[in-house]
Design a protein with these regions (language model features):
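Immediate post-signal-peptide N-terminus of mature secreted/exported proteins
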Residues: 2-27
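Mature-region segments of soluble proteins
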Residues: 12-20, 35-45, 50-148
């Protein structure tokens, strides 16, 4: 495992929480965010969010009264709901990392009907929408100062 500066208990809690945020789906044939490959990517991707994620995990442990990963399904669901309500910015950083890593996984992209590849140089086709929806934005006065 890479140097992620998390304790073994924090890693277990993060993995359990990632699986609660995005559980596996047999219907769509996709893994949960606690899948080995996806979770390894999460640990490698903590980067600038490491401090917020450590704060979030410490808060989660306080709410759980110990290790979140050791809770039963019913209690962990209660703690997760409470954590979602009070987690604030640290939780938002944690969720962002989980989502970014989850949607980088080839299996997930294929389940969404997307070819698992970078958007360039081939690009992706974006369906045309109703451009008139932007009319209220275009009608607004400028919100910036002109440079000339």
């Amino acid at each position: 495992m890479p140097n992620h500066d998390l304790t073994a208990e924090q890693v277990r809690d993060l993995r359990a929480l990632a699986g609660a945020i995005i559980p596996p789906s047999a219907t769509y044939g996709v893994p949960g965010a606690d899948d080995e490959k996806i979770f390894s990517d999460i640990l490698r991707s903590l980067g600038r969010d490491r401090d917020d994620i450590c704060r979030a995990l410490a808060h989660l442990a306080r709410l759980a009264g110990g290790a979140f990963a050791d809770l039963g399904p019913e209690r962990s669901a209660q703690v997760a709901v409470n954590f979602r309500e009070v987690g604030g910015t640290p939780l938002a950083a944690l969720v962002r990392v989980v989502l970014l890593c989850y949607y980088r996984d080839d299996r997930v992209m294929r389940s969404l009907g997307q070819e698992p590849r970078p958007p360039f140089p081939k690009g992706h086709v974006v369906e045309q929408g109703d451009w008139s929806l932007l009319d209220p934005v275009r009608a607004r006065p400028r919100m910036y100062r002109s440079v000339d």
